[in-house]
A protein has these predicted regions:
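Active-site histidine-anchored catalytic micro-motif
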Residues: 1-230, 234-237, 245-250
Length: 251
C-alpha cells in the first residue's frame, strides 16, 4: 500500500523544488548533535511551526528507524492505529514503513490495531516526513496514530514500543507529534504550555497526562507524548531538554 500525501500544498509546499528548499532552510545544520531516545515536535503548517521542528531534528543524530506517534484529529479509525506495511509518499519521494519493527510493536500491544483508516486524512505524522527527507539520510518509519487518550491506552502503547525497540537492538528514535495550546491568547498559551513542558522535561508521563486534563490545556498530542515518555523511561531516559518553543503569534 502507498499512502498518498493529503496536506501537500497547504501545510507545506506542493512541488518538490519549493518543498526541498523550504525544508532545507528549516533544518539548521551547524547545531551540536545528540543521540536521543525521543523527541516532541509540532505539526502545524511549516510557516507556523517548521522552524521549531527543524531545530529539533537538527539536534538529533539520525537513526535508522523513526517511530512516529501522532494524534488522530479526525476521529476516524481505530483508537490506536498502526500501519505495518507499505510506503508513504510526499513530493520528495516515498518513505518505507519498517515492517519488522511495526509488527513487533503490534505483537507487544493489547491496544494497537492494524488500521490504515485512521491515517488516511491525518496530517500529524505526514508533515514530519519531508523535514526528515530533507536531511538526506535514508530511513524507515513506523506510523502510530492515537485517538484514545486514556492513560491506560498510552501506557500500553508506550510499553509495546519500548519492548519492540529493546528487542530490535537497532538505531530507533521515537517522535511524538504535538502542537501546544490552541485558541487562547499568547499570554494564556505560554502559562498553560509551561505546565505541560515542565512535565515533559521532568520525564513524567503521569504528571503530563494529569496536568493537561486538570488545567484544560489544549495540547492536541498530549496522549502520543505521554506514550513516548512512558517508552522513553522504560528505555532508560532520565533527562530532557527544551530545544525551542514559540506560539503562532510569534510568526
Amino acid at each position: 500500500m502507498i499512502r498518498r500525501a493529503v496536506v501537500t500544498g497547504s501545510f507545506y509546499p506542493g512541488t518538490p523544488e519549493r518543498l526541498r528548499t523550504q525544508a532545507a532552510d528549516l533544518i539548521i545544520g551547524d547545531l551540536p548533535k545528540v543521540r536521543a531516545i525521543g523527541a516532541v515536535v509540532p505539526h502545524a503548517g511549516y510557516i507556523y511551526s517548521g522552524r521549531i521542528a527543524g531545530a529539533v531534528y537538527a539536534r538529533l543524530i539520525f537513526p535508522d528507524v523513526f517511530v512516529m506517534l501522532g494524534p488522530n484529529h479526525t476521529g476516524v479509525g481505530a483508537g490506536v492505529a498502526i500501519i505495518t506495511e507499505g510506503k508513504w509518499e510526499t513530493p520528495l519521494g516515498q518513505v518505507p514503513i519498517d515492517t519488522e519493527l511495526a509488527k513487533a510493536i503490534l505483537r507487544n500491544s493489547q491496544t494497537i490495531e492494524e488500521d490504515d483508516l485512521g491515517h488516511q486524512r491525518e496530517h500529524s505524522i505526514e508533515v514530519q516526513l519531508p523535514l526528515l527527507q530533507a536531511c538526506g539520510r535514508p530511513f524507515s518509519f513506523v506510523p502510530i496514530c492515537l485517538f484514545s487518550s486514556e492513560f491506560a491506552a498510552c501506557q500500553d502503547v508506550g510499553l509495546a514500543v519500548a519492548r519492540a525497540i529493546a528487542e530490535s537492538q537497532r538505531s530507533v528514535l521515537m517522535v511524538a507529534s504535538s502542537d501546544m495550546s490552541h485558541y487562547v491568547s499568547r499570554e494564556q498559551a505560554k502559562v498553560k504550555d509551561r505546565l505541560a513542558i515542565e512535565a515533559i522535561l521532568a520525564c513524567d508521563p503521569e504528571r503530563l497526562h494529569r496536568v493537561v486534563r486538570w488545567e484544560g490545556i489544549t495540547m492536541c498530542g498530549f496522549h502520543p507524548t505521554t506514550a513516548l515518555l512512558i517508552a522513553a523511561k522504560e528505555l532508560g531516559a532520565t533527562s530532557a531538554e527544551l530545544v525551542s518553543y514559540a506560539t503562532s503569534a510569534d510568526v
